[in-house]
């Protein structure tokens, strides 16, 4: 049995080897323990040659980077350092040290590492950098075991570790880092992440102040350090107490920068951290302040599920603020969320967690991770369902704003969301049910808006619809929708199929419902007393329009066919007049009227928005009310529309109600529904009984003649309803209602909410006597002070927009001219170069001065690249200067600028300590030759003699003597007394640029510093992709000169306006002694002079001038 004998021997050898290894490991651990227990004062450093132990000293820990290369291959390491290195190699994969056979030894080693090394100041101060790094690595490995994390706390090591991390971080962020600085920070951030992963231990971290250092490391330049800080902060932010402390620091600005500019992994971790922090109100406010909404919405184009999930939950939290909710809609966030819900995108994801990423980062394996792993279909489905639930949550919060809710419906959102309520038996039941709850909640919020309710009546069967209604308006609790989901899932297959068909019926992207004339009917928008309104599109066009269908059999048009035909004729005639005459921003445009099948169709402008009546109902259900500013904004626009109709067009609307007043974006008012409008002659009265009785004036109810003041009465009713959310005259008994209207009896507006001007205006408009009731001009005069404030804001906004448009126009023109000039210059250079060569060759063969020209020709031939490239640089500067100063481009002006620039360059060269080099001489010489070649040879030779007479040293060469003689014959004598020292303009520009860059390289501040942020944004605009060297020179030059010209606003954000307001009580600049910028100035932005002032203030605060004077 030779094989069995061989196997037995092999087994014995293996057992002996394992036994030997265990014994050796035990011996190594004991030796390390003994070394660590040696007091720092008795420790001997160094002891062994590093090269001899290099084979045993690892490269398996990639985190140990050779920050400084070994000096000539010789470097001595202490015995302890070698043992620590061996320890990190042998136990790099061990995680449960407390269950290891040598647990006691490990615990003693850990205790010694903390007591005798980490918290021993004497040892820390004298230990080599690589030695302390190895101590940190061993601590990191041991602290994978939770038992050792508690021991570290008991020994008081957390505070010392936090202090050391702060010291290293300050050196690192101050660009004075020592060896292994990055590796130390990576290991320490890992340790704090492990501590923060346990809920009860997070308080230890914040008590040590480590969270402040972690926040400052968000400005780190190395990815591993940044990721370590993000991972540790994300673990800390799981606790509400820690979140509160982190939110007190300047964290949002750096997080938004990472989300905007960094790699996918950094963005993913940052989004997760920001999601956790957004539970704090001040974090949400900072996201708004630092204009984070566009950055967050730009990330919705990503295909990574985890990144998208985190970003959407950030949006859910920040859109609780009404202004942020509106901003999300303006930036197209609603469309993007609905696009994600449609499910026609291919997503990717991965299985990594905070813990696994932290371990990979500390071990140097972070770059090897795949952030787009091939997940199973089940995992992808699970992540996608979570993402869809997040989208529904975001749309729910956005739907609290009526305009947002209307856009969701307009973008086919009800159909997209309703599809998610259908059961999906292939997915995880718990997750599918949760998604159904989120979808039902979004639909219920949309249903709360009255105009959307007819849509939902078509969706659900009666029993399910009753449960849907009983939940109530705007109920956020997701648990309230579980019974509704259970009831839906218990329906029979046929009933579910019917619901699915109902959902398909509300799809706005299906084929048109029908065609009326040349118009395709796309959707039913609403119904009124005289007909319906549809959204339509012309067969041959793309523009959306509104079409009102009026049923001519309505009794209001007459009792018999003859009366109806007469009424229709008059209405069509009046509408034709209106169509041709009305051009006002607050009055709807009419395009066409036609008859078809006993129905009158009126084609008009489609107003995006909701009727004022729906806003009343929505605010009442939310228990909110109009602010007085918003109330006046709407009423003033209504007055402007009525003044235009009454006084300029002599048109009485006759049916002015909240449902005929559309509110668009930013509460823009549009008066609609002129189907009952009547154009009257001067001083004539109308007698027909039309309109809505709730808003009808007394003279209409008494069948007396009436005029334009009937609309004033209706306007007063609408103003009253804006203040109380209820009409002034309301009763179920028609006789009682008519009596109240005739006598003008209504409940007074509650006191304390609005000013007396509101109640006075209502009282005057609701005067029962038509003769005593004011017309619309008199009403406007009553609120003249309010209208003047409104007009002032409009004028300010218009002026700011006009100036911004003018700056954009000039900048576009400047860039266009520069691009064309550069193209022309390039072609001109090539043409002149060939012409010069030809002229020189011709002159050298025919002129008596051949020797001199030969020397020049051979000199330029020595460096062909230099002779071509450098003049182009000078020419570029000349072109840029012309473009930026917006001079004309005539030849004389160009030569004048060229002489001026040449004088500056020559002055600079004379002021230098050494003589000008030949490239400068050749550059200016070549420019002169090109510039004067078009003006004549005489001028060319004069300029050449002038250059030579300045004493510029020629390039050494065989023809040098000829050129020197020529130079000497054309010299210029200048008295020494008249020579003055000049200031180098380039040096002044560099000094200013140095100041800007110095400020942006200061260590990040823990608290908000708006001045530094403004300077940082200014620096980014200087070096952005849209900038160029010419623009950089011009901007810095204006800054150094303190130009009063405003800086282009492409880099300023709302935080700068906060800075302006915070400084309103102080002097801003020498030219602004009041120091109180108006709102107009804030809109205009900052001048170079003001930016210079801010820069100098920050330099003073940072001690810049103290350092420079000592230097």
UniProtKB/Swiss-Prot annotation:
What is the main EC category here?
transferase
Q: Any idea where the Protein kinase domain is?
A: 519-791
Q: Which residues form a coiled coil?
A: 481-514
* UniProt note on tissues of expression: Expressed in the mammary gland, lung, spleen, and kidney.
Q: Which Pfam families match?
A: Pkinase
For bias type Polar residues, the affected ranges are 47-63
Q: Which GO terms describe its cellular component?
A: extracellular region
Q: Where is the composition biased (Basic and acidic residues)?
A: 1-16
Q: Which cofactor does it need?
A: Mg(2+)
The active site consists of 655 (proton acceptor)
Q: Name one GO biological process term.
A: mucociliary clearance
Q: Give GO MF terms, alphabetically.
A: ATP binding; metal ion binding; protein serine kinase activity; protein serine/threonine kinase activity
Under the heading CDD domains, the entry gives:
STKc_Nek10
**Which residues does the record give as ATP binding sites?**
525-533, 548
> What reaction is this protein's catalytic activity?
L-seryl-[protein] + ATP = O-phospho-L-seryl-[protein] + ADP + H(+); L-threonyl-[protein] + ATP = O-phospho-L-threonyl-[protein] + ADP + H(+)
Ordered alphabetically, the record's keywords are: ATP-binding, Coiled coil, Kinase, Magnesium, Metal-binding, Nucleotide-binding, Serine/threonine-protein kinase, Transferase
> What is the E.C. number?
2.7.11.1
Q: Where is this region: Disordered?
A: 1-24, 47-72
Assembly behavior: Interacts with RAF1 and MAP2K1; the interaction is direct with RAF1 and required for ERK1/2-signaling pathway activation in response to UV irradiation.
| Function, as annotated | Plays a role in the cellular response to UV irradiation. Mediates G2/M cell cycle arrest, MEK autoactivation and ERK1/2-signaling pathway activation in response to UV irradiation. In ciliated cells, it is involved in the regulation of mucociliary transport.
Q: Which family does it belong to?
A: Belongs to the protein kinase superfamily. NEK Ser/Thr protein kinase family. NIMA subfamily.
Name of the protein this chain belongs to: Serine/threonine-protein kinase Nek10
Per the UniProt record, the lineage of the source organism begins with:
Eukaryota, Metazoa, Chordata, Craniata, Vertebrata
What's the encoding gene here?
A: Nek10
């Amino acid at each position: 049995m030779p094989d069995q004998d061989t196997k037995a021997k092999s087994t014995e050898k293996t057992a002996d080897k394992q036994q030997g290894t265990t014994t050796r490991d035990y011996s190594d651990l004991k030796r390390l323990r003994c070394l660590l227990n040696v007091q720092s004062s008795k420790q001997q450093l160094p002891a062994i040659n590093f090269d001899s132990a290099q084979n045993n000293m690892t490269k398996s820990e990639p985190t140990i980077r050779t920050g400084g290369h070994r000096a000539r291959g010789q470097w001595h390491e202490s015995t302890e350092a070698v043992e620590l290195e061996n320890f990190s190699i042998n136990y790099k994969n061990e995680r449960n040290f407390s269950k290891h056979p040598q647990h006691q030894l490990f615990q003693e080693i850990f205790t010694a590492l903390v007591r005798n090394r980490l918290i021993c100041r004497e040892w820390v101060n004298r230990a080599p950098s690589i030695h302390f790094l190895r101590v940190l690595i061993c601590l990191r490995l041991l602290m994978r075991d939770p038992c050792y994390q508690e021991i570290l706390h008991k020994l008081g090591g957390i505070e010392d570790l936090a202090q050391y991390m702060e010291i290293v971080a300050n050196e690192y962020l101050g660009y004075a880092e020592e060896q292994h600085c990055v590796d130390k920070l990576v290991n320490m951030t890992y340790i704090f992440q492990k501590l923060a992963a346990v809920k009860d231990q997070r308080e230890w971290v914040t008590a040590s102040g480590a969270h402040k250092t972690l926040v400052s490391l968000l400005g780190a330049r190395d990815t591993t350090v940044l990721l370590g800080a993000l991972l540790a902060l994300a673990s800390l932010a799981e606790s509400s107490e820690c979140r509160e402390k982190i939110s007190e620091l300047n964290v949002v600005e750096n997080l938004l920068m990472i989300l905007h500019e960094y790699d996918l992994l950094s963005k993913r971790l940052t989004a997760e951290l920001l999601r956790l922090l957004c539970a704090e109100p001040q974090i949400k406010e900072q996201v708004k302040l630092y204009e984070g909404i566009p950055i967050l919405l730009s990330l919705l184009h990503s295909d990574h599920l985890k990144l998208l999930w985190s970003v959407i939950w950030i949006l859910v939290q920040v859109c609780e603020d009404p202004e942020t909710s509106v901003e999300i809609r303006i930036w197209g966030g609603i469309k993007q969320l609905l696009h994600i819900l449609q499910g026609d995108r291919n997503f990717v994801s991965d299985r990594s967690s905070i813990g696994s990423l932290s371990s990979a980062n500390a071990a140097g394996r972070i770059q090897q991770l795949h952030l787009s792993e091939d997940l199973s279909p089940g995992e992808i489905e699970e992540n996608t369902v979570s993402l869809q639930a997040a989208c529904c949550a975001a749309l729910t919060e956005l739907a609290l704003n009526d305009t947002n809710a209307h856009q969701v419906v307009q973008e086919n959102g009800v159909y997209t969301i309703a599809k998610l309520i259908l059961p999906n038996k292939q997915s995880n039941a718990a997750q599918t049910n949760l998604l159904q709850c989120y979808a039902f909640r979004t639909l219920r919020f949309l249903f709360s808006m009255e105009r959307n309710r007819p849509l939902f009546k078509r969706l659900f069967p009666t029993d399910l619809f009753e449960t849907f209604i009983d939940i109530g308006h705007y109920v956020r609790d997701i648990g309230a929708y579980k019974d509704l989901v259970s009831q839906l899932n218990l329906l029979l297959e046929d009933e579910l199929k019917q619901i699915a068909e109902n959902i398909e019926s509300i799809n706005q992207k299906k084929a048109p419902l029908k065609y009326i004339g040349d118009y395709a009917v796309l959707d039913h928008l609403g119904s009124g007393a005289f007909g319906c309104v549809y959204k339509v599109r012309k067969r041959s066009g793309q523009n959306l329009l509104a079409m009102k269908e009026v049923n001519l059999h309505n009794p209001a048009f007459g009792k018999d066919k003859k009366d109806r035909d007469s009424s229709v004729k008059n209405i069509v005639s009046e509408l034709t007049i209106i169509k041709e005459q009305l051009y006002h921003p607050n009055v709807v445009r009419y395009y066409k009227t036609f008859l078809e099948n006993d129905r009158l169709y009126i084609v008009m402008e489609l107003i995006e928005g909701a009727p004022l009546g729906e806003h009343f109902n929505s605010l009442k259900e939310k228990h909110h009310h109009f602010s007085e500013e918003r109330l006046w904004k709407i009423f003033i626009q209504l007055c402007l529309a009525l003044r235009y109709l009454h006084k300029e067009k002599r048109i009485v609307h006759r049916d002015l109600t909240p449902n005929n007043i559309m509110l668009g974006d930013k509460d823009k008012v549009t008066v609609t529904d002129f189907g009952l409008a009547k154009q009257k002659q001067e001083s004539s009265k109308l007698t027909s009984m039309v309109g809505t009785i709730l808003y009808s004036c007394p003279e209409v109810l008494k069948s007396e003649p009436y005029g334009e003041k009937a609309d004033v009465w209706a306007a007063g009713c609408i103003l009253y309803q804006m203040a109380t959310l209820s009409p002034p005259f309301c009763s179920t008994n028609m006789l009682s209602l008519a009596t109240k209207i005739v006598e003008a009896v209504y409940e007074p507006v509650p006191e304390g909410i609005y000013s007396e001007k509101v109640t006075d205006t209502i009282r005057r408009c609701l005067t029962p006597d038509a003769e005593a009731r004011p017309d619309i001009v008199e009403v406007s005069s009553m609120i003249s002070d309010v209208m003047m404030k409104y007009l002032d804001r409009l004028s300010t906004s218009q002026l700011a927009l006009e100036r911004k448009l003018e700056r954009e126009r000039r900048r576009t023109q400047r860039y266009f001219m520069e691009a064309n000039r550069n193209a022309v210059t390039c072609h001109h250079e090539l043409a002149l170069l060939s012409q010069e060569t030809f002229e020189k060759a011709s002159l050298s063969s025919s002129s008596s001065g051949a020797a001199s020209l030969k020397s020049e020709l051979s000199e330029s031939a020595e460096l062909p690249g230099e002779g071509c490239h450098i003049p182009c640089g000078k020419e570029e500067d000349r072109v840029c200067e012309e473009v930026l100063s917006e001079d004309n481009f005539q030849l004389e002006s160009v030569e004048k600028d060229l002489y001026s620039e040449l004088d500056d360059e020559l002055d600079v060269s004379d002021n230098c300590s050494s003589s000008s080099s030949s490239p400068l001489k050749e550059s200016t010489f070549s420019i002169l030759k090109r510039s004067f070649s078009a003006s004549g040879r005489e001028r060319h030779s004069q300029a050449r003699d002038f250059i030579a007479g300045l004493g510029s040293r020629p390039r050494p060469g065989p023809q040098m003597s000829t050129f020197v003689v020529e130079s000497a014959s054309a010299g210029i004598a200048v008295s020494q007394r008249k020579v003055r020292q000049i200031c180098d303009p380039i040096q002044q520009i560099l000094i200013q640029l140095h100041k800007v860059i110095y400020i942006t390289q200061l260590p990040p501040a823990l608290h908000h510093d708006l001045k530094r942020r403004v300077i940082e944004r200014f620096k980014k605009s200087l070096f952005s992709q849209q900038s160029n060297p010419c623009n950089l020179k011009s901007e810095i030059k204006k800054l150094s000169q303190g130009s009063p010209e405003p800086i282009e606003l492409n880099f300023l954000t709302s935080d700068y306006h906060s800075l302006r307001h915070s400084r309103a009580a102080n002097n801003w600049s020498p030219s602004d002694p009041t120091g109180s910028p108006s709102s107009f100035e804030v809109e205009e932005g900052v001048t170079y002079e003001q930016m210079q002032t801010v820069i100098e203030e920050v330099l003073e605060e940072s001690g810049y001038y103290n350092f420079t004077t000592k230097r």
